[in-house]
């Protein structure tokens, strides 16, 4: 490593870091894997590997990651994060056998995107997305019609997201925001005089745009998607995420429930989808410890968190896994009591102001 990495290396040694992999295919069809390190100091690019001719099985991925850990320093690595592909599960098993102090977790953003995808496959949501797409395709298929649409709503209708179903959400949200203008457009003399509504696709688009059931479907789909899309945006940004992931998902479920007046029959399937992905990938000891050690959530929910027990258990698991010095383990537990009682440094007003800020980073504050 060259001197330009000094700031990164110092951060790795002080607060630990995460090794992340990103597999993709370039324009020439070559398989490429990027390897990066994320820490409180920022993101550091370690290298890119052309793996086109390699058998990308668990052993191969493990060996790539294992080499990176040697380069970064095993004591500095808290976790490895990859997507949720099956092949990575084998790699994680091999790593845990060799380096038991390091966690291997699936990418939270990928997991949440899979939740959105599963929700998008629910029959009523899928029908709404299909109708919405047919409506926007019709509006964008004719230059004169597109100009008229922009005149009525004052902007473009279609938006792009970071994933397919994030895009579906953004487009449904855009339709929802412009419902009145679109209904006015399809009832206008200007559109009628253009003749497009006499076409088969025009008649179908008009029927969709003026349908109460369609707009109800849009509202429901947006209410399912939006809370999770907000979590996805946070997980896929530079804003500190690990300490907020568990709490953000709880908030997303509460918001969905509130949208439907807490009538569980209206969102039960969506909750089952969320919980299945969440329970399988995002309720590890590290995620639970992050929630426990984030004062933004801990202090307002202290009683529930302590009574639950699984969050403290997750923290103890992390301590024993990451710290092999028993004296240091005991010191951490002693400091934990100060945290629980909001004593010492935690009692100071400056500390209280920080933890009440949702952009606060519990890892470096």
Predicted regions and their residues:
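Short alpha-helical patches at protein termini and domain edges
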Residues: 1-365
């Amino acid at each position: 490593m060259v001197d330009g990495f000094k700031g990164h290396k110092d951060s790795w040694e002080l607060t630990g870091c995460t090794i992340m992999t990103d597999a993709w295919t370039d324009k020439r069809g070559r398989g490429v894997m990027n390897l990066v390190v994320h820490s409180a100091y920022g993101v550091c690019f370690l290298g890119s590997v052309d793996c086109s001719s390699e058998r990308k099985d668990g052993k191969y991925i493990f060996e790539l990651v294992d080499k990176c850990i040697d380069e970064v320093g095993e004591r500095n690595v808290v976790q490895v994060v990859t997507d949720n592909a099956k092949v990575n599960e084998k790699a994680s098993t091999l790593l845990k056998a060799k380096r038991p102090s390091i966690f291997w977790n699936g990418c939270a953003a990928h997991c949440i995107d899979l939740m959105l995808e599963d929700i998008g496959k629910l029959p009523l949501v899928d029908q709404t997305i299909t109708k919405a797409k047919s409506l926007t395709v019709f509006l964008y298929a004719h230059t004169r019609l597109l100009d008229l649409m922009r005149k009525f709503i004052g902007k473009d209708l279609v938006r792009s997201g970071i994933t397919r179903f994030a895009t579906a959400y953004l487009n449904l949200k855009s339709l929802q925001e412009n419902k009145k203008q679109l209904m006015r457009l399809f009832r206008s003399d200007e559109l009628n005089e253009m003749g497009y509504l006499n076409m088969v696709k025009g008649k179908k688009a008009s029927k969709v745009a003026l349908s109460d059931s369609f707009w109800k479907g849009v509202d429901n789909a947006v209410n399912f998607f939006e809370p999770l899309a907000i979590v996805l945006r946070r997980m896929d940004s530079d804003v500190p995420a690990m300490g907020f992931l568990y709490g953000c998902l709880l908030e997303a479920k509460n918001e969905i429930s509130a949208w439907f007046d807490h009538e569980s029959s209206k969102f039960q399937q969506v909750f089952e989808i969320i919980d299945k992905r969440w329970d399988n990938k995002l309720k590890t000891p590290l995620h639970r410890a992050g929630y426990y050690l984030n004062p933004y959530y801990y202090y307002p929910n202290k009683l529930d968190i302590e009574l639950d027990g699984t969050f403290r258990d997750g923290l103890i698991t992390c301590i024993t896994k990451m710290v092999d010095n028993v004296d240091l383990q005991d010191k951490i537990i002693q400091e934990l009591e100060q945290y629980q009682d909001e004593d010492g440094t935690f009692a100071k007003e400056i500390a209280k102001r920080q933890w009440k800020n949702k952009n606060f980073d519990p890892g470096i504050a």
